[in-house]
């Protein structure tokens, strides 16, 4: 609506009374480039406040004057404007990464576009952008590597890819409102890990349930929730019986004698069924002697079948040959039977038995898995999420074992200040290139990390262990099987049994900053190259170009940088270059006249321009991040004041 106002000095403004103005009605955008701690390289990201600046580009650092760039940006933002920040490039920059064949490799990923434009196979995981900030991060992954651990066995001759079988006869099968018992059937699994190489003890293997085989030899896919391997046990039953050896007459000559004389000690005659042996039990009937219960033979001497027996207890009473003492000998025999329950069989792909175990311990694999942190206390995977398995998307297309969990941890606390802190959790992602969560959320782990993670990219695919087996075609024996190959990650889910890698960790190392390993000295040419990205006014809308620190070791380097920024402003003709003097000309110069002369000398060679503003120095302010007072250039404040004035005047 048109307003015709005739009263002098009256103007109309729309004001939001909740905040006192119209926020964003007149956006004032600054721009700065420099060697920030982290962030994408040469990508002008719009930052609205100091919190965004910290989250995207890190904090000010007390190294090589890096804080001047950061605090200039912060000063501008404090006036209410927004800021396009560019992190400058350097030939020394390197992303922290976990290499494929080495601990880390030389790799620089500048940005998301740089990542998607290239193929990376020399690392498994890398920090999202270059710098030492990524050193110390650890990436942990886990997939459906195994269902159970079978321990207490000898692993000699056993290798990954062999089969495991166990009878399930007599086990109860729960149906819909009914229960039945399995007949002559057995469950099959595949070995995915052996000993310490499989992440378990030297006397253990990891096993994944695959299917069950009916008595008719029919394969039926099954899961760990339906069937599992039970611990193998052996029970021994022992029974005792008493066998009569025979009876024989004998004499006891002394009142408390331990010998019996004149007895038949062999089966040659005299009522004996077999020879008397040590340990036989002796009893007596008739005569005058008393033999204590449990008395046994401990010695035998004989001549022509007639002899003397020595016993372990004294016999009371004397019995002569006419007293009619009859001694009976019996023998206790022991028998035992062994019953093996849930025997576990290891077979190769030809159905040939490799090992048979009668004593094992079967336990859940996932519940034993931890991250393996050495600082801040370890964390169990089952406290983070349930075990990954097969996604609904893959299952509906005949695929399996595609799910994977990925967690990023600050183990030593260098990034977050808390050792063992979980920085990111990416759960139930898919190894399938077309993997989705219904209805259409992409969860292919490589793309998901690229789009959603703030910390890491994926490079090469891991997972080299096959996780399935099937009967050989045309073979009547289901003991003969083929491994299900072709399970590499990064293909469409249809019909693929994806390979597994288990519980893995990846240390990110090798990250480098702008100079040396962790320095921030940067060539002025690299900074100017970043500013040159802003030359096209149709691509990026900006109002103020902030010089930041004067840059360069000499006044000539500083003048070259200032001249380049003024040239960009002159070319665009829609923004102002905010320039501060050479640092060495004003900081720590006690004489104000000398400072003035230095400022004049600095600005004199610079070209005149309607699109540049020169200020006169550096301000002394407190850096709360490093607990120290700093000198920083005023161009951030000058640009901020102009932005604030514009906002107040035209909003």
Task: Tell me the role of every PLM-derived stretch.
Residues 194-201, 246-333:
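Polar, enzyme-active/binding microenvironments
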């Amino acid at each position: 609506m048109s307003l015709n106002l005739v009263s002098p000095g009256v103007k109309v403004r729309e004001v939001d009374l909740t905040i006192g103005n119209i926020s964003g009605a007149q956006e004032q955008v600054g721009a700065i480039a420099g060697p920030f701690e982290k962030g994408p390289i040469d990508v002008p990201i719009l930052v609205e406040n100091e919190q965004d600046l910290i989250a995207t580009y890190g904090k000010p650092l007390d190294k090589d004057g890096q804080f001047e760039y950061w605090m200039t940006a912060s000063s501008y933002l404090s006036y209410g404007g927004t800021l396009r920040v560019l992190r400058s490039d350097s030939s020394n920059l390197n992303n922290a990464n976990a290499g494929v064949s080495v601990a880390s490799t030389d790799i620089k990923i500048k940005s998301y576009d740089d990542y998607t434009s290239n193929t990376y196979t020399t690392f498994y995981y890398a920090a999202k952008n270059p710098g030492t900030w990524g050193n110390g991060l650890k990436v942990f992954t886990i997939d459906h590597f195994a269902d159970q651990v079978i321990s207490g066995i000898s692993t000699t001759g056993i290798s990954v890819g062999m089969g495991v079988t166990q009878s399930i006869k007599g086990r109860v099968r729960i149906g819909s409102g009914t229960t039945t018992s399995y007949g002559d059937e057995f469950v099959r699994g595949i070995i995915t890990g052996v000993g310490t190489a499989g992440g378990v003890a030297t006397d253990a293997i990891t096993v994944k349930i695959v299917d069950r085989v009916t008595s008719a030899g029919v394969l039926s896919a099954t899961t760990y929730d339906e069937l599992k391997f039970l611990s193998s046990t052996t029970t021994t039953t022992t029974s005792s019986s008493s066998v009569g050896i025979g009876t024989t007459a004998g004499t006891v000559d002394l009142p408390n004698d331990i010998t019996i004389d004149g007895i038949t000690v062999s089966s040659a005659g005299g009522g004996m069924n077999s020879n008397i042996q040590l340990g036989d039990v002796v009893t007596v009937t008739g005569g005058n002697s008393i033999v204590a219960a449990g008395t046994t033979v401990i010695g035998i001497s004989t001549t022509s079948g007639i002899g003397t027996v020595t016993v372990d207890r004294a016999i009371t009473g004397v019995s002569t040959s006419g007293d009619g003492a009859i001694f009976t000998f019996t023998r206790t025999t022991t028998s035992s039977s062994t019953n093996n329950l849930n025997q576990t069989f290891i077979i190769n792909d030809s159905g040939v038995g490799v090992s048979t175990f009668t004593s094992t311990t079967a336990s859940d694999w996932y519940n034993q898995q931890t991250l393996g942190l050495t600082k801040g206390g370890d964390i169990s995977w089952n406290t983070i999420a349930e075990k990954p398995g097969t996604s609904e998307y893959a299952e509906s297309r005949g695929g399996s074992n595609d799910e994977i969990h990925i967690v990023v941890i600050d183990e030593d606390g260098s990034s977050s200040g808390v050792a063992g802190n979980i920085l990111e959790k990416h759960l139930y992602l898919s190894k399938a290139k077309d993997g989705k969560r219904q209805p259409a959320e992409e969860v292919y782990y490589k793309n998901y990390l690229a789009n959603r993670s703030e910390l890491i990219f994926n490079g090469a695919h891991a997972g080299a262990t096959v996780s399935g087996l099937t009967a050989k075609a045309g073979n009547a024996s289901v003991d003969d099987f083929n491994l299900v190959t072709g399970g590499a990650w990064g293909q469409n889910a249809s019909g693929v049994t994806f390979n597994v890698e288990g519980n893995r960790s990846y240390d990110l190392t090798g990250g480098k900053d702008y100079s040396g390993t962790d320095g921030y000295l940067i060539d002025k040419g690299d900074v100017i190259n970043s500013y040159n990205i802003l030359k096209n006014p149709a691509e990026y809308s900006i109002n103020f170009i902030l010089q930041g620190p004067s840059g360069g070791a000499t006044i000539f380097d500083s003048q070259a940088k200032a001249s380049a920024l003024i040239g960009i402003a002159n070319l665009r003709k829609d923004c102002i270059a905010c320039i501060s003097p050479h640092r060495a000309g004003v900081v720590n110069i006690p004489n104000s006249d000398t400072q003035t002369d230095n400022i004049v000398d600095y600005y004199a060679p610079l070209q005149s321009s309607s699109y540049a503003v020169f200020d006169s120095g550096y301000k002394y302010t407190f850096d709360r991040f490093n607990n120290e007072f700093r000198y920083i250039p005023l161009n951030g404040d000058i640009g901020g004041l102009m932005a604030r004035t514009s906002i107040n005047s035209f909003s």
